[in-house]
UniProtKB/Swiss-Prot annotation:
Keyword annotations from UniProtKB, A to Z: Cell inner membrane, Cell membrane, Electron transport, Heme, Iron, Membrane, Metal-binding, Transmembrane, Transmembrane helix, Transport
Membrane topology category: Single-pass type II membrane protein
Gene name per UniProt: torC
Binding site for heme 4: 170, 173-174
Subcellular compartments: Cell inner membrane
Record-linked Gene3D superfamilies: Di-heme elbow motif domain
Ranges that cross the membrane: 17-37
Native source species: Escherichia coli (strain K12)
Chain positions recorded as heme 5 binding sites: 329, 332-333
UniProt-listed PROSITE patterns: MULTIHEME_CYTC (PS51008)
Function recorded in the entry: Part of the anaerobic respiratory chain of trimethylamine-N-oxide reductase TorA. Acts by transferring electrons from the membranous menaquinones to TorA. This transfer probably involves an electron transfer pathway from menaquinones to the N-terminal domain of TorC, then from the N-terminus to the C-terminus, and finally to TorA. TorC apocytochrome negatively autoregulates the torCAD operon probably by inhibiting the TorS kinase activity.
Cytoplasmic topological segments: 1-16
Highest classification ranks of the organism: Bacteria, Pseudomonadati, Pseudomonadota, Gammaproteobacteria, Enterobacterales
Name by which UniProt lists this protein: Cytochrome c-type protein TorC
Sites where the protein binds heme 1: 48, 51-52
Length: 390
């Protein structure tokens, strides 16, 4: 150790002190300049689109207002995709090495078809990154305080005032502003396929993942009602491919009592019943809903159904439903806070938006129930709180 220290202290017999200082300066400058030049070059739009996998999204960008507009200000790739702060920039550069790996080594995005198959995954990753830093790259140009709402469209001005008040992240509402939106259904439909593949009806308490017909007796051909998605049943008996189940729910006492709901006064549907299933129900209790002064009865129905499309834990269903919500309602605008509406209010709200989606009946039912079970007047019930509201 002493020899090493002495060697470091003594001037080199071969090089002068001046030469060593000069070499040190050159190395120091190189260590400063080369990374800077490297970052600058690899941040240019020309460099970004030099990979052929980026050509389709480049053409999409050229059709956007960020490429050509009345003011002549152009947002380049780095303006949107590289955070302005040094730590964020370095982190993003390191993450970008994965893009190179996926293109040239893994070959997962090296054709238009492969890229399209992963578009939703790539977009969600970028949205999450922008959400995490509160759209810092957007804010390097756009500033809530600098906006003249009088020059905006009235609806845009209204939305921007709300966003400014809450300091909302730009990406919440402005997805797809520079690139084509992905088909988000590919993500949540794959998730449903995985949920269906993991179906497990071994427990005493089960939850439906699909709309399932129910029957008055085992082996019946004609259904006596339907069990709706994300509904709980108790298993009374197992017989081959059939399950005898017990369904509990509320119905308005003065009505036809064909629809069971999760809570009295809230139209969160559990099941529809008719025929012999309806005739054999038991009334467990009654209560009056103060808001409407109507009497509701808690009923218990016994029925049969075929095995399949049932799980013994509600949480995977809610995780799938959350993907449904974010993948569907974020397409046109920022998805509102679920607790902004009450359970009954979500029916009309979702009906007003459902025409802009490609959801099928099962997906629509699952999404509605998820929203209702996390609404302002039921928040927490979707996570295991069984306390009923009177």
């Amino acid at each position: 150790m002493r020899k090493l220290w002495n060697a470091l202290r003594r001037p080199s017999a071969r090089w002068s002190v001046l030469a060593l200082v000069a070499i040190g300066i050159v190395i120091g400058i190189a260590l400063i300049v080369l990374p800077h030049v490297g970052i600058k070059v690899t941040s240019t739009t020309e460099f970004c689109v030099s990979c052929h996998s980026m050509q389709p999204v480049y053409e999409e960008y050229k059709q956007s207002v960020h490429f050509q507009n009345a003011s002549g200000v152009r947002a380049e790739c780095h303006d949107c995709h590289i955070p302005p702060d040094i730590p964020g920039m370095v982190k993003r550069k390191l993450e970008a090495s994965n893009d190179i790996y996926q293109t040239f080594i893994a070959h997962s995005i090296d054709t238009p078809e492969k890229f399209e198959a992963k578009r939703a995954e790539l977009a969600e990753r970028e949205w999450a990154r922008m959400k995490e830093n509160n759209s810092a790259t957007c804010r390097s140009c756009h500033n809530y305080d600098a906006m003249d709402h009088a020059k905006q469209h009235p609806e845009a001005a209204r939305q921007m005032k709300v966003a400014a008040k809450d300091n909302q992240s730009c990406i919440d509402c402005h997805k797809g502003i520079a690139h084509q939106l992905p088909d988000m259904s590919s993500g949540f439909r794959k998730q449903f396929d995985e949920l269906r593949a993991s179906a497990n009806d071994s427990g005493d308490t089960l939850y439906s993942i699909d709309i399932k017909p129910i029957y008055a007796a085992k082996g019946d051909k004609e259904a006596s009602g339907s069990l709706l998605p994300a509904s709980e049943v108790k298993v009374l008996k197992r017989d081959g491919d059939w399950l005898q189940i017990e369904i509990t729910g509320w119905t308005e006492s003065a009505g036809r009592q064909r629809v069971l709901t999760q809570f009295p006064g809230k139209r969160i549907f559990v099941a529809s019943i008719r025929g012999d299933v309806q005739q054999q129900v038991k009334t467990l209790e009654k209560t009056t809903v103060a808001d409407t002064n109507t009497e509701w009865s808690k009923l218990q129905a016994t029925a049969w159904m075929k095995k399949g499309d049932m799980v013994n834990d509600i949480k995977p269903i809610w995780a799938y439903a959350d993907s449904l919500y974010n993948g569907t309602c974020n397409q046109c605008h920022g998805a509102p806070e679920i607790a902004h509406f009450d359970a009954n209010g979500w029916i009309g709200t979702l009906n007003g938006m459902i025409g802009f989606t490609s959801l099928d009946k099962r997906e629509e039912r699952t999404l509605l129930k998820y929203l209702q079970m996390n609404a302002s007047d039921t928040a927490g019930k979707a996570h295991g709180d069984k306390k009923e509201e009177k």
